[in-house]
Curated annotation (Swiss-Prot):
This is Cytochrome P450 monooxygenase calL. It comes from Penicillium decumbens. It comes from the Eukaryota. Pfam families: p450. GO terms for biological process: mycotoxin biosynthetic process. Belongs to the cytochrome P450 family. GO terms for molecular function: heme binding; iron ion binding; oxidoreductase activity, acting on paired donors, with incorporation or reduction of molecular oxygen; steroid hydroxylase activity. Calbistrin A has been reported to possess a number of interesting bioactivities including antifungal active against Candida albicans and cytotoxic toward both healthy and leukemic human cells.
Length: 533
């Protein structure tokens, strides 16, 4: 047995003893039987905690099984009580603004563990109870001279990431950069490539440059391997084993934060805040107006180290969702040539030839409204996004006939998107991709519909903390698919392992990403393609 293995086992043993001692102290305080409390998940506290931290896929399977008899199941993550919630009415309830539950706890955990914010910085956000809206929550005005932190950050996202003109400018910049990469492919010749590798390089870099400019890659050799490793390990910073048991995620965090710090420092040195680019939609130092405004806000309220951590998390959040979702969508289309050509026809119908350049351009709004393309998009997210929407109970609240106690957490796994009772259709199990699942044909032509199931579909979270990048993400994914299916003939050669060796099965969800992010495929697809124009 190696020294490193013995060290790991010893660390796990010490960690287990520490947990048991803690439980011995606090368990007596929990004894008592409240009939209004929801039923408990089976298993011991220690086994549930360990499985939650190391095997989210298996843990959520147990939760799903338990929720067949109760929509709310409780368990303890160490000393913290957590309610796992499903059911349309319950999901709607936790996503409504409420004085009894707060979405802030998840963001504060991200700040502390993924951004690397200090206790003092996290404390300032905790103290700010004024909310995200323009007007402070009644009775929670901040003191004179103190910033409204939640509102300040929310305003940047609302103005520069979600407002139609800024969102369209950002997606158009991305499409320009991505198209430039596609035109470098040989015209009329068949070539081979691995699909996931293409998306993780060409698509990811086009999106990064559109958002953050080119300097972050130029300043940091080895940027992409480090970014993807950070994306893989970031969920473990939130819910995984302690740093002293598993230090690797924190080591990668520090390395990637350092890269982002170089980018932030260089932009601050080189950008002229009194020059003509101060209101530009895009310039090469910061990249997009959104990035410039967000970093400007952060530098007024956070340390340079935490600002870099915020940038790192934003980059991870952007690429670790849109890239695997685009990969999955294209894998499904390529594996089904009839579907591929049907989506192509829709995309061509949403495009025109530019008379000045002869280039094909897309009407973005028309493209986003195409029924089959929308159904493919929703079906992809339904199957391949896995997040646990998290809320903190701040006052006693009744939910589904149960009373949830203050200080506890509520989590709603998006795995409900795969429940047969919600999404299953004859001949089309909820566990399988079906492009027609979100279409109806009442008028004789296909129409997109969610059929009243929106409460069972929340890949971007919900309520006041819903993902601010969802507008850009949808445009980015659909424009990527449209560009590829209209420009290329693509044929499946074989499925491969990530190292390029042949696989005996198609891709499945990589279970190590369950619970916190868009899930990438665990296999790659080797294809041959030919550029048509």
């Amino acid at each position: 047995m190696s020294d490193s293995t013995m060290d790991t086992q010893l660390a796990l043993l010490v960690w287990g003893i520490a947990v048991c001692v803690t439980l011995a102290i606090v368990v007596p305080r929990w004894i008592g039987n409240n009939s209004k409390e929801p039923p408990s998940l089976g298993g011991s506290m220690l086994s549930n905690t360990y499985q939650y931290m190391t095997d989210m896929h298996g843990f959520l399977q147990r939760v799903a099984s338990a929720q067949r008899s109760s929509k709310i199941i409780k368990f303890r993550l160490g000393p913290k009580k957590i309610y796992m919630v499903s059911g349309e009415k319950n999901i709607q309830a936790i996503n409504r603004p409420s004085h009894s539950i707060s979405p802030d706890v998840f963001f504060l955990e991200v700040m502390a563990n993924v951004w690397g914010a200090s206790k003092e910085e996290v404390g300032k956000f905790k103290q700010d109870q004024s909310g995200r809206s323009k007007n402070p929550v009644p009775g929670h005005d901040v003191k004179p001279g103190q910033p409204r932190l939640w509102h300040g950050q929310h305003r940047v996202y609302s103005e520069y990431l979600q407002r139609t003109d800024h969102a369209n400018a950002l997606s158009n910049k991305y499409f320009q950069l991505f198209s430039e990469r596609l035109t470098k492919q040989p015209l009329g010749d068949w070539t081979e490539l691995r699909l996931s590798h293409f998306f993780e390089s060409d698509m990811a870099e086009a999106a990064l440059v559109a958002l953050m400019g080119p300097r972050i890659v130029e300043l940091n050799p080895g940027f992409w391997p480090t970014m993807w490793e950070f994306a893989r390990l970031a969920p473990r910073l939130m819910w995984g084993l302690p740093r002293w048991v598993n230090p690797k995620p924190w080591e990668i965090r520090e390395l990637f934060h350092g890269m982002c710090r170089r980018y932030v420092d260089a932009a601050k040195r080189e950008f002229d805040w009194n020059g003509p680019d101060v209101d530009a939609g895009w310039e090469p130092h910061y990249g997009s107006r959104m990035a410039r405004e967000l970093i400007s806000w952060a530098e007024k309220n956070l340390s340079p180290e935490t600002t870099a951590g915020m940038v790192a998390t934003f980059i991870f959040g952007t690429n670790a969702n849109s890239v695997p979702m685009s990969t999955w969508a294209m894998m499904e289309l390529i594996a089904d040539p009839e579907l591929y050509h049907a989506v192509r026809e829709e995309c061509l119908a949403a495009s025109t030839l530019d008379p000045a350049t002869g280039e094909r351009v897309f009407d973005t709004q028309k493209l986003l409204s195409m029924p089959l393309l929308q159904s493919v998009y929703i079906e992809t997210l339904r199957l391949h996004v896995s997040i646990n929407v998290t809320r903190e109970v701040t006052q006693p609240i009744s939910l589904d006939g149960h009373v949830l106690t203050p200080g506890s957490l509520i989590q709603a796994p998006s795995q409900i998107g795969q429940y047969s009772e919600v999404w299953g259709c004859d001949g089309h199990p909820a566990s399988q991709f079906w492009a027609g699942r979100h279409l109806k044909h009442d008028s004789g032509r296909p129409e997109f519909t969610m059929a009243g199931r929106t409460a069972s579909f929340f890949p971007f979270g919900g309520g006041p903390s819903i993902c601010p990048g969802r507008v850009f993400a949808k445009q980015e994914i659909l424009m990527t698919v449209a560009a590829l299916v209209t420009r290329f003939e693509i044929e499946l050669i074989e499925w491969t392992h990530p190292d390029g060796s042949k696989s005996d099965r198609p891709a499945q969800n990589d279970q190590s990403y369950i619970g916190a992010v868009g899930i990438p495929p665990d296999r790659d697809m080797k294809v041959r393609w030919k550029r048509l124009w």
